[in-house]
Amino acid sequence: MRLLFAGTPQTALPSLRLLLESSHEVVAVLTRPDAPAGRGRTPRPSPVALAAEQAGLPVLKPRRLADPETLAALRSLNAELAVVVAYGALVPEPALAIPRHGWVNLHFSILPSWRGAAPVQHAILHGDEVTGATTFRLEPDLDTGPIYGTVTEPIRPDDTAGDLLNRLARTGARLLLDTVDGIAAGVLAPRPQPTEGVSYAPKITPADARISWSSPAFHVDRLIRAVTPEPGAWTTLAGRRIVLGPVRLAEPQHAPGATDDGSLAPGEIRVLAPGEIRVERDRVLVGTATTPVILGTVQPAGRRAMPAEAWARGARLAPGARFE
């Protein structure tokens, strides 16, 4: 079957590579325009564009899919089916009508849960234990089309969004190929999405990724993992922005005075106010609304990430120092 592949980030590469190795013919790749990247903000092609160029495929980078010249270019490809993996823009109705078998999208959730731009991040943020991937037929509305197939993936307690997305990209690629095979053979028909269990996963902005230390420890942990690596969880210290990597929960929490001299008994943790930092010999604790969390990595503005203990030694924190 003649395929048009639409995708942009690294996440789409396992699907593109698997389709290129299959019996199907990828006739062209559709991706987002070159975007500024790096410190110099120099425009760079997307990971999918680079992979397509290396494979000798034609690459289309339109700013608007609805432009007449873009629609004409899509028609000229004579693609029988278009497949989408994290393309990064809605496909308008005139484009949806071009391939004979329509457009199939690989979405990283079990639809109808977490429709939208950030399904993996929201699954972690809300404490889901299982997620997955879904192939479905694109419609004009957001992630509402009938479903071809699904695959499930457990969410591990220490998963970041990056970890989980990497696994889903691989398992989803196989699901996508199976879907394309089924459509090509005429043996796979989509079924309507369930009307119950609909939830939405809007894009998470840098503002959303700011840590609220007045939240419970479990929420701080989930937020940090949900926005790692992008956009990155952050806080401030003395007005300066600091990015934090995943944390561990410190259990249990006790008030001081557990021993006769007021010191802490082995394994006990002094109560900390939300955001308050306590530096110990082999760990750095921060208070939340419940139990403290143990910091993993710390990245001050303009510097590389480092272990929290190394950061604390160099920061020379005053007693009672607190993240805002």
Curated annotation (Swiss-Prot):
EC number(s) recorded for this UniProt protein: 2.1.2.9
Catalyzed chemical reaction(s): L-methionyl-tRNA(fMet) + (6R)-10-formyltetrahydrofolate = N-formyl-L-methionyl-tRNA(fMet) + (6S)-5,6,7,8-tetrahydrofolate + H(+)
Domain of life, per lineage: Bacteria
Keyword annotations of the record: Protein biosynthesis, Transferase
Residues engaged in binding (6S)-5,6,7,8-tetrahydrofolate: S109, I110, L111, P112
GO molecular function per UniProt: methionyl-tRNA formyltransferase activity
Any one annotated GO CC term: cytosol
One Pfam family of this chain: Formyl_trans_C
The keyword Transferase belongs to this UniProt entry's keyword annotation: yes
InterPro entries: Fmt, Formyl_trans_C, Formyl_transf_N, Formyl_transf_N_sf, Formyl_transferase-like_C_sf, Met-tRNA-FMT_C, Met-tRNA-FMT_N
Functional description taken from the UniProt entry: Attaches a formyl group to the free amino group of methionyl-tRNA(fMet). The formyl group appears to play a dual role in the initiator identity of N-formylmethionyl-tRNA by promoting its recognition by IF2 and preventing the misappropriation of this tRNA by the elongation apparatus.
Record family assignment: Belongs to the Fmt family.
Protein name in UniProt: Methionyl-tRNA formyltransferase
